[in-house]
Amino acid sequence: MRRTRSAVATGPREQRRSGATGGLSGGESRAQRSRSRTRAGAGGGGGAVGPQPSAKPRPKPPPRAQEAAAEEPPPAVTPAASVSALDLGEQRERWETFQKRQRLSFEGAAKLLLDTFEYQGLVKHTGGCHCGAVRFEVWASADLHIFDCNCSICKKKQNRHFIVPASRFKLLKGAESITTYTFNTHKAQHTFCKRCGVQSFYTPRSNPGGFGIAPHCLDEGTVRSVVTEEFNGSDWERAMKEHKTIKNMSKE
C-alpha cells in the first residue's frame, strides 16, 4: 500500500513542476516580445514603425578574406586577350598564326613589326665593355660613319665614334656599373665601366640629345663598312660652325 501511495503522490508533483516550468517559459516569451517592441519603437522616435524590407543585408567577408582580396594581383593579360582588344578584321587568323610560329608574345610581335618598318635600312648592333658588365643595343646603318675627334680628351682615349639618336639606343644591363667623367662645359658625358674602364658609348658634346657609340666595342657580324672622318675638336667652335651635318645627327 505504501508503494501505491508513493506512486500516486509522485504524479501530481511532477505535473506541478512541469506547469511551473511552462509558466516560466511563457513569462520569458512575453518579456522577449516586450523588449523587441521597445527596440523597434526606439529608432522611430515614438512614431509608427513602417514596414521593414524583407531582403537581408549581405554578410561582410571576414577581415582576412578582405585582406586577401586586396592583396590579390589583377589577372595577367594574355596574348589572346590583347589581340581580342584590337580590330584585326580578316587578318586576325594570320596574326595569331604568326605569333605561334615565331613564338612571340603580343608585345614581342608588335616590337618586331615596329622595328622592321620604323628602322627601315638599319640593323640592330649589340655591344658592350670588355668585362661584360655593360651591354647595349643600337639601331644604325650597317655602313658606319665614324668621327675621329682630336680634342684633348678624345685624343688621349682615342674616342672614335658614330652618333645615333637616343631613341635608337638601349642599355641592356650595367647601369650600376657605369661611372661618368665631365670637364669644361660638362656637356659631354664620358661614361666608363667601373670594372674594366672601357668606354663603349658616351654622350657627345656635339649631340647632347644622342649617343656616341664606339664601333670597336660592337659585336662582330653586323658592320658592313666603316668610313672615318677627322673632326678638329681642338678648335671646337670653328669646327662646329664649319661642319654642316654633325649637330643634327642625333635628330630623328
Curated annotation (Swiss-Prot):
The keyword Metal-binding applies. Residues 1-80 are annotated as: Disordered. It comes from the Eukaryota. Keywords: Cell cycle, Cell division, Centromere, Chromosome, Cytoplasm, Cytoskeleton, Kinetochore, Metal-binding, Methylation, Mitosis, Nucleus, Phosphoprotein, Zinc. The modification Phosphothreonine is found at T78. It holds the Pfam family GFA. The modification Omega-N-methylarginine is found at R39. It is found in: Chromosome, Centromere, Kinetochore; Nucleus; Cytoplasm, Cytoskeleton, Spindle. Residues 125-237 form the CENP-V/GFA domain. The modification Phosphoserine is found at S18, S234. Required for distribution of pericentromeric heterochromatin in interphase nuclei and for centromere formation and organization, chromosome alignment and cytokinesis. This is Centromere protein V. It comes from Mus musculus (Mouse).
